[in-house]
Amino acid sequence: KALILLYEGEDHFHRLYLMRKTALKIMQQLSPFNPRLIGSVSTGHIREGSDIDLHVFTDDLETLLRHLDNLGWQYDLDEVAIKQGNKVQLYTHVYFFLEYPIELSVYDTLEIRVTQRSSTDGKPIKRLKPKALIALIEAEHPELVMQHDS
């Protein structure tokens, strides 16, 4: 937190808090799909154009899309090729905007047990469940939690 404040200021830290709160709201809305927060919002390394990256898990894409439709969220779909070892796997990504840009990476249900590796650095991706995100918000943003929840 101290380094973030030193280099980027209070606005950056407040935006991180708001992005995490938005991610939590979305995760709660998507609970049937076991959402996990990944990327810059989970690590705290957000930049100006950062989006909220979530992994969701379903064996039926249409069920997810119906759920999004029922929530009234307008979205775009794309197929993204991810190289895993020596094979290429296609994954559906869903893009929408709710206060911030959101990207859902859609995986089969059983892949929730698979530790994904980052396409940028090859390291295991840390995925936060909603409870872990709540704990992170309370630990890293206690004064903002008190301010916004009172």
Where are the regions a protein language model picked out?
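Catalytic core of pol beta-like nucleotidyltransferases
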Residues: K1-E48, T58-S150
